[in-house]
């Protein structure tokens, strides 16, 4: 392991031990905000500290085994050589774990998120597929014990959605779902196709972290255009006799957010403002990422809607992720929410990308 990485690990362990001492200080215990902040930092450092201590222990075991391998007794030497082999394998495993733990954590990873799905090319079939994607994410959220709530929906006449946005609440929701952003393509025979021809349709997905209330960027009310209108169901049918639905336009960016899910105008406005804050923050992040992308390659793409990330081929029962050339012949399971076999390899590829960038810096 490089000396620069060892120094960094030693510094983190020192900080962990310092916080451990501070958490026993009556002055800190009496200050809830400080105690909460330090407890969170302590928790974040716990895994890497324990892993580094295990690594140092494995290094000591290797040293002792190598010394034992010099023994005159052949039986003792053979046993020591086996221990040397095991210790070296353990050290390599722990080094890999430490490198992953050292990857800078995205501060948004633990947050709730908004998932926005829009039908693209393909007419009615694209709208139906947008509905299928929402169902897939809903099933996946259920498996993870997350809560999913529709914020706004514009239903397609043939089923599914022209566009919709949902909030996913649960531990680590954004960190798991963020790589779903991009273009999703479907290849299948539509129910209305009498000749049995395969059609190609597309949807786009955008995943945005929820911005905590304390961190919501200050939005000048003069920059907002707020319209009210009546909530409508599928096919434009009015389902509410009051103008409870809200449309907010952020004039400087042109971002438009609608919410008509609640009967209360006040609740719809609060939800719309929450989505607007997430979109503005996301737009600022994308601008920063575009600048960073010019300095280093991003293996997983930008997460922009224009990036086609995945194809769902129904006749062949396969789903392919184009960012990591992964193909799985288990489309039915994926569409039922069994998505970890798709999501985890992408997260691992991202980690490998981050490790490569860290190696260049060191």
Swiss-Prot record:
Keywords: Cytoplasm, Methylation, Protein biosynthesis. Peptide chain release factor 1 directs the termination of translation in response to the peptide chain termination codons UAG and UAA. NCBIfam families: prfA, PRK00591.1. SMART domains: PCRF (SM00937). Residues 285-311 are annotated as: Disordered. GO terms for molecular function: translation release factor activity, codon specific. Pfam families: PCRF, RF-1. It comes from Photobacterium profundum (strain SS9). It comes from the Bacteria. One of its GO terms (cellular component) is cytoplasm. Its main location: cytoplasm. The modification N5-methylglutamine is found at residue 237. It is found in: Cytoplasm. Belongs to the prokaryotic/mitochondrial release factor family. This is Peptide chain release factor 1. Methylated by PrmC. Methylation increases the termination efficiency of RF1. The gene is prfA. Residues 285-295 have a biased composition (Basic and acidic residues).
